Curated annotation (Swiss-Prot):
The gene is rplP. Part of the 50S ribosomal subunit. NCBIfam families: rplP_bact. SUPFAM superfamilies: Ribosomal protein L16p/L10e. This is Large ribosomal subunit protein uL16. Keywords: Ribonucleoprotein, Ribosomal protein, RNA-binding, rRNA-binding, tRNA-binding. It comes from Rhizobium leguminosarum bv. trifolii (strain WSM2304). GO terms for molecular function: rRNA binding; structural constituent of ribosome; tRNA binding.
Length: 137
């Protein structure tokens, strides 16, 4: 699963996801892509599950690019522990996704295979997404 090799700080504030994606909103590598439609936190397990679903349907033909990286540590206190006594330990890593953010890109396959592969991948994610295609000039 994806996670940073090293970080400056172990824990982070929760924060809020406001606005739309400034960068990373266009197709940069592939011919087809999966674009986020709503803001949410996507964890590393979801990204990995989506990647597996996409590559499995494509039968390892073509190429997949993951355009998001889980760099936010999400903490959790153990069950049945009273409030206070500090912040909990890091439970998993997540990525804050804004609307308009390109999450996955694929290339080297036909449109119908790409559409179905990304549909299967989007089912694993906790954000509403849509299929996008590069406009031929």
């Amino acid at each position: 699963m994806l996670q940073p090799k090293r970080t400056k700080y172990r824990k982070q504030f929760k924060g809020r996801i406001k606005g739309v994606a400034k960068g990373g909103s266009d197709l940069a590598f592939g011919e087809f892509g999966l674009k986020a439609q709503e803001p949410n936190r996507v964890n590393a397990r979801e990204i990995e599950a989506a990647r597996r679903a996409i590559t499995r349907y494509m039968k390892r033909a073509g190429r997949v690019w993951i355009r998001v990286f889980p760099d936010v540590p999400v903490t959790k206190k153990p069950t049945e522990v009273r409030m206070g006594k500090g912040k909990g330990s890091v439970e998993y890593w997540a990525c804050k996704v804004k609307p308009g953010r390109m999450m996955f890109e694929i290339d080297g396959v036909s449109e119908e295979i790409a559409r179905e592969a990304l549909r299967l991948g989007s089912a694993k994610l906790s954000v509403k997404t849509r299929f996008v295609q590069r406009i031929a000039e």
